[in-house]
Amino acid sequence: GPKDTIPPVIVYMNPDNFTTNIDTLHPPKIYVEFNEYVQIKDQQKELYTSPAMKKKPSVVRRGKGIVVTIKDTLRPNTTYAINFGSSIQDNNESNPLHSMRYVFSTGDTVDSMYMSGYTADSYEADSVSKSFIYFFIADSVERPTEWDSTMFKYKPHVIARAEKNGIFIAQNLKPVDYRIYAFEDTNDNMEYEPSIDQIGILDTTYNPSKMP
């Protein structure tokens, strides 16, 4: 027969996607079921959380699904997203389920604003594909003077990752002012290394409720 080119389809989640009032100290295990058996590929490189957790969630297979265990104490009144990248693939032909996300909140609501953008190399006028975009709530970090140490002193409130064409969509933003940083993740370790990673900084604050 013809080669299977269709990625897995989600058929069930527990708790549901966009669940609110998740316990910060004892978050539940998350079960996601698919219409076929799946494999988990390149989890260390593909999976990330927004905001970052001190310990990455563990993801294991169970039947036709996966079980996600959160190993960190969560922040109160915070919207979290577990981004799986292309790590979830079908068992037979390794067709990836691109950009799968599981979103939940430890508060009463899920932050729902977003920003789309593009990361580019200012010297070569080309897109930067292996890049992460960090959003810091402006009121929570110092205003830089001579030297900007934000990336080393603070943890981002929202994290996005650019596609191969440099385009990114940052989701689950609040209607507040953000300072935005983008860096090229040369070593695929999801950490900014100033000796090898390029970095760019938006020269103004950004508020998704006031700007497109």
Predicted regions and their residues:
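Acidic, low-complexity Ser/Thr/Gly/Pro-rich repeat segments typical of extracellular/periplasmic
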Residues: G1-N172, D177-R179, I199
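Structured interaction patches on ligand/partner-binding surfaces of diverse proteins
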Residues: H98-S99, D185-P212
